[in-house]
UniProtKB/Swiss-Prot annotation:
Converts the free carboxyl group of a malonyl-thioester to its methyl ester by transfer of a methyl group from S-adenosyl-L-methionine (SAM). It allows to synthesize pimeloyl-ACP via the fatty acid synthetic pathway. GO terms for biological process: biotin biosynthetic process; methylation. This is Malonyl-[acyl-carrier protein] O-methyltransferase 1. It comes from Ilyobacter polytropus (strain ATCC 51220 / DSM 2926 / LMG 16218 / CuHBu1). It catalyses: malonyl-[ACP] + S-adenosyl-L-methionine = malonyl-[ACP] methyl ester + S-adenosyl-L-homocysteine. It is an enzyme of class 2 (transferase). The gene is bioC1. It holds the Pfam family Methyltransf_25.
Length: 268
């Protein structure tokens, strides 16, 4: 079974740090939608953002929580440096280069935010168990991630080209995410939407993915020849486009969770 290679994730996002904002239309849409679920406050909170990237959602956190202490965490040093340049110096900001699964601070957080990051973590149950341990009681998590219909056109086209060929990582269904998070949290909100992108061809689509550092981070990624790309483009275009464009579906999930004292209680 293919698993996500964290070292490759780091390398890919570091290479894409400078071009990320030019291609990150989906991530910007997700940030705008996620912000709808966030109620700001002038109170001082301890806040963690997981996967701050170039600071797209970080800017929204700063605006909504101007008096809070905010830790911005990302696995990629280059992403963190880009976020620093964008956000500027602030005594309320602390930048951390770390994999969230290895992050074990002494303090607890009141709020955890994450935009378009959790899809890069294989074991979602383990992730949310860990996030539970980082939150104070009554603390909340608000996040966006990618759902199971993301890039379904690419997966179907690849399967038609070669049934053994796998390219993009597995994305979860909303009901699967609900089942995972309901074990430890009270679910305050759960929603999904779709963002359709259009590209001239498959190469342009994959170039855009590479531009944000999101090119496949699977450890069993196989190389494509020019002939395979040409064949893939024809299959994709015939099924999910026309002579001018191809359609790319992004299935987006949003959730808000609250940590409760009885983590094993069957909450309603």
């Amino acid at each position: 079974m293919a698993i996500i290679d964290k070292k490759r994730v780091n390398q890919n996002f570091s290479r894409g740090a400078k071009t990320y904002d030019n291609y990150a239309q989906v991530q910007k849409h997700m940030a705008d939608k996620l912000e709808i679920f966030v109620h700001g406050s002038k109170k001082q909170y301890n806040i963690l953002e997981v996967g701050c990237g170039t600071g797209i959602f970080s800017q929204k956190i700063l605006k909504r929580f101007p008096n809070s202490k905010i830790d911005l965490l990302d696995i990629s040093p280059a992403m963190v440096e880009t976020a620093k340049e964008k956000l500027g110096d602030s005594p309320n900001l602390n930048f951390i280069v770390e994999d969230v699964e290895n992050y074990n601070p002494e303090k607890k957080y009141d709020l955890i935010f994450s935009n378009a990051t959790f899809q890069w973590i294989d074991d979602q149950m383990r992730l949310f168990n860990h996030l539970y341990s980082l939150l104070d009681y009554g603390g909340k998590i608000a996040f966006s991630t990618f759902g199971n219909k993301t890039y379904f056109e690419l997966r179907e086209s690849l399967s038609t080209l070669d049934p053994e060929l796998k390219y993009s990582q597995k994305f979860v269904k909303l009901d699967e995410m609900t089942e995972i998070t309901n074990k430890n949290f009270r679910i305050l909100a759960a929603d999904e939407d779709f963002f359709i992108e259009k590209f001239e061809n498959v190469m342009a689509f994959l170039k855009a993915i590479k531009g944000i550092g999101s090119n496949s981070a699977l450890s069993n990624k196989r190389n494509f020849t020019r002939e395979k790309f040409k064949a893939l483009d024809k299959i994709y275009r015939d099924k999910f486009g026309d002579k001018n464009i191809i359609n790319v579906t992004n299935h987006l999930l949003y959730m808000v969770l609250e940590k409760v004292k009885m983590r094993d209680e069957n909450l309603k």
